[in-house]
C-alpha cells in the first residue's frame, strides 16, 4: 500500500528535467497528499566548500508569507529587556535559571535570542545549542538589543540558513496549504537571501541546482533562471 502511494506521487515527475518555478510549485502541491499539512522545502546546491572560512554561507531571511508553523522563542535577557521579550510574545524568558534548564537538557523552543550582555552565560551552552543550530549569533540578528524586533521576526517567519558540508542550504518555506503565489514569493525571498550571502571565496557558478519538495513528496528540480539572477 505504501509502495503504491509512493509510486503514485512520483508519477509525472522526471528527475532529469528542470521545471519552471510556477509549474514545479503546482506539481509539489498536487503530490502533497499526506493526512497532515506537509511542509514545502527548498534546497539549493551551491558552488562552495564550507570547510573554508571564506566560503561559508549563512544568513537569515524574513519570508513575506511566514512559514506556516508555530515557532517557540526563548530569550536570554534581564530586567527591562526581559520584560520587552515577554511583551513581544516570547515563550520562554530568563537568565541564569534558563541557562541551567538548557544545560540540563530541556530545550522547549525552536529559536533562541540573547542580549549581548548575556552571551558570557549563553556561551556555556555552545555544546547544547550549537549542534542544533540554535546558538544566538549577531550575524543572523539573534544577539541583539532589539529584543522586540527579533522576537517578532522569529514569530513572523524569519528563517535562518547555513550551508552544510556538501554545499547544500535548505529550509522549510511554507505549507502545502499555502496558495501557489505565497509559496512562490517565499521561495524567491529565500533564494534572493542566499544569493546576497554569496561569500567572497566562491568561485565559478554559485547556484548549481534548486529543487523543491513536500515532506513526503519527491523533489522537483527548478530552472535556475526561474529563481536566480543571471549572474548568480
UniProtKB/Swiss-Prot annotation:
Signal peptide extent: none
Cystine crosslinks: none
InterPro entries attached to this UniProt entry: Ribosom_uL1_bac-type (IPR005878), Ribosomal_uL1 (IPR002143), Ribosomal_uL1-like (IPR023674), Ribosomal_uL1/biogenesis (IPR028364), Ribosomal_uL1_3-a/b-sand (IPR016095), Ribosomal_uL1_CS (IPR023673)
GO cellular component: cytosolic large ribosomal subunit
Stretches assigned to coiled coil: none
Keyword Transmembrane: no
GO MF term (any one): structural constituent of ribosome
Gene3D superfamilies per the UniProt record, alphabetical: 3.30.190.20, 3.40.50.790
Keyword Lipoprotein in annotation: no
UniProt keyword terms in alphabetical order: Repressor, Ribonucleoprotein, Ribosomal protein, RNA-binding, rRNA-binding, Translation regulation, tRNA-binding
GO biological process: regulation of translation; translation
HAMAP family given in the database record: Ribosomal_uL1_B
Quaternary organization: Part of the 50S ribosomal subunit.
Entry's family note: Belongs to the universal ribosomal protein uL1 family.
Free-text function comment from the UniProt entry: Binds directly to 23S rRNA. The L1 stalk is quite mobile in the ribosome, and is involved in E site tRNA release.
Protein name: Large ribosomal subunit protein uL1
Organism: Rhizobium rhizogenes (strain K84 / ATCC BAA-868) (Agrobacterium radiobacter)
Amino acid at each position: 500500500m505504501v509502495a503504491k502511494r509512493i509510486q503514485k506521487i512520483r508519477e509525472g515527475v522526471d528527475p532529469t528535467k528542470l521545471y519552471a518555478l510556477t509549474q514545479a510549485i503546482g506539481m509539489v502541491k498536487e503530490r502533497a497528499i499526506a493526512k497532515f499539512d506537509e511542509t514545502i522545502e527548498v534546497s539549493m546546491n551551491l558552488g562552495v566548500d564550507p570547510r573554508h572560512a571564506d566560503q561559508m554561507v549563512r544568513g537569515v531571511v524574513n519570508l513575506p508569507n511566514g512559514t506556516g508553523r508555530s515557532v517557540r522563542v526563548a530569550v536570554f535577557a534581564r530586567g527591562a529587556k526581559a520584560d520587552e521579550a515577554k511583551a513581544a510574545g516570547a515563550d520562554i524568558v530568563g537568565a541564569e535559571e534558563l541557562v541551567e534548564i538548557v544545560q540540563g537538557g530541556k530545550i522547549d523552543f525552536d529559536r533562541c535570542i540573547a542580549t549581548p550582555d548575556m552571551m558570557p552565560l549563553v556561551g556555556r551552552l555552545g555544546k547544547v545549542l550549537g549542534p542544533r543550530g540554535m546558538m544566538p549569533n549577531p550575524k543572523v540578528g539573534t544577539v541583539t538589543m532589539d529584543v522586540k524586533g527579533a522576537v517578532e521576526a522569529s514569530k513572523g517567519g524569519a528563517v535562518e540558513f547555513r550551508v552544510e558540508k556538501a554545499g547544500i542550504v535548505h529550509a522549510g518555506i511554507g505549507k502545502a496549504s499555502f496558495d501557489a503565489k505565497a509559496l512562490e514569493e517565499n521561495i524567491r525571498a529565500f533564494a534572493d537571501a542566499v544569493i546576497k550571502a554569496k561569500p567572497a571565496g566562491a568561485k565559478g557558478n554559485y547556484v548549481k541546482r534548486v529543487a523543491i519538495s513536500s515532506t513526503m513528496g519527491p523533489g522537483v528540480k527548478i530552472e535556475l533562471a526561474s529563481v536566480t539572477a543571471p549572474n548568480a
